[in-house]
């Protein structure tokens, strides 16, 4: 039976820009990142497969966070010489929205006047918090950065990128909130801003155990490699885990309706046949995207009579809509619909669909993931030990008996404080707690979470 899930999806609290303004900003972003292509630069994950559990997470350092069920956006901040500070949200469709009434200071000290970012590009998710809260709250959760104040940092590894967010975005913004509560608590302040909770991959079990404490919907986990740069477009090291039965595909829906012949008219008359749009379609094709405007028939949607009535009662256009579907357990040859994807103009590309199908067939269950966490942790600590031994050997050969530690090789728990004598940020500052947990974490828990606590009172 079709499941038209009623989900409270966030709405962007701003004004969409016209074509000329959008193109100007697209080119500005491309230039900032050293790209010729002005397309959406955000990284896209691939589906988690069994070899990622048995091989990838055992051999590489990864951080994990919950996968928010919201609206993926990039946040772009500039300081125009004539128009002043501009804050924009960029959707996956590469549309730009101007966000008014919000300020991101560049420094902690604005006593002598406001300071402004120019050329800061952050990756995140706009979520609507409706769980465990008295009233809905719109929040932008930052989880990565592409550029900070005109500096392209995509070549940096994840710990460095998160360090930049902590020192040059979250700390100044948090200080601004503390000093200006009347501004951030005003009705026209567009949304709250937070740094998404992350932890090392072997704590995935802890993240899963606290999913029900989140204030927003979440439908899985995201594993981000700590040893690789930020990748534009599909990133084969960025992993999206969902339980096998919750893996979904976005298709384009095409309905084939019955045609009837009017017995009172000549069959040769073109007006003698009509399409019955009121009755349930004979067939609903699910079409897969092959790029550009090219789609091909791929599979079929299961639809009961009561499901059709439910769709009709929506009184919305149905033909050609992008729909999120999952395989029907009772009939693997068909799929069932979960919801419309109004935020997407195309379905998943066929190459992505192939990977999702493989992930469904060879999926990793939540129990298997939890069971593997101690092994992942042991492998992580073994890598740290082997790297430290290698560092000692190399320093011994040069006659140094007390080598300086390589900060990039240390576990996250050893990099939670930034050495301010370094020329640029590295590691993570602030507390290891986060607003996303409905209850405060106990002392000693999640000691290696690379995140930052804002000053919200929730």
UniProtKB/Swiss-Prot annotation:
It comes from the Eukaryota. Gene3D superfamilies: 3.30.1490.430, DNA ligase/mRNA capping enzyme, Nucleic acid-binding proteins. It catalyses: a 5'-end diphospho-ribonucleoside in mRNA + GTP + H(+) = a 5'-end (5'-triphosphoguanosine)-ribonucleoside in mRNA + diphosphate. Its EC number is 2.7.7.50. CDD domains: Adenylation_mRNA_capping. It is found in: Nucleus. It is an enzyme of class 2 (transferase). Its main location: nucleus. Heterodimer. The mRNA-capping enzyme is composed of two separate chains alpha and beta, respectively a mRNA guanylyltransferase and an mRNA 5'-triphosphate monophosphatase. Second step of mRNA capping. Transfer of the GMP moiety of GTP to the 5'-end of RNA via an enzyme-GMP covalent reaction intermediate. This is mRNA-capping enzyme subunit alpha. It comes from Debaryomyces hansenii (strain ATCC 36239 / CBS 767 / BCRC 21394 / JCM 1990 / NBRC 0083 / IGC 2968).
